[in-house]
Amino acid sequence: MLSSFDDFPIHQTSQPVARTGSSDLNHYDRYFFNGYTRDTRLYFAAAMGLYPNRHIADASFSVVVDGGTADARQINVHASRRAPNDRGDANQVGPIVVEVLDPLSALRLTVESPEHGIRCDLTFVRRSAPLEEPHFFHQVGQRVVMDSTRMTQFGTWEGW
């Protein structure tokens, strides 16, 4: 199945972009972010995962206010949907959206969940170049348990 990304020279296999290079049901692409205010009063974490071989996209956003005190509060938002075949539509899951503004330099995270009392519009701006972590391969007997490469990057957050 062709998708809007097939117009770009980004293919990693001879197949359309919508088809993964692995038949592993656990194959995924994922974002994970966290941040805190300078006074450390507020901490948040966000994640968004695309599991194309399971046709699932999941996202979560968690915020902790006054952590480490008797008044600490935590609010969580979780969302899930059928994963779209077109990866161009994969970065919105329920009220959580991740937008790539400048590849490897700036990303926008928005959450619009008034029923949970959470709204945010945050932009991650890199402070360091992305670091490709060493490739991780774990096998038990003949079964591959994990075959992955991750990227880590430091930056600052702007917004509300």
What positions do the PLM features span?
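Targeting-peptide/extracellular-domain and disordered-appendage signature
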Residues: M1-W160
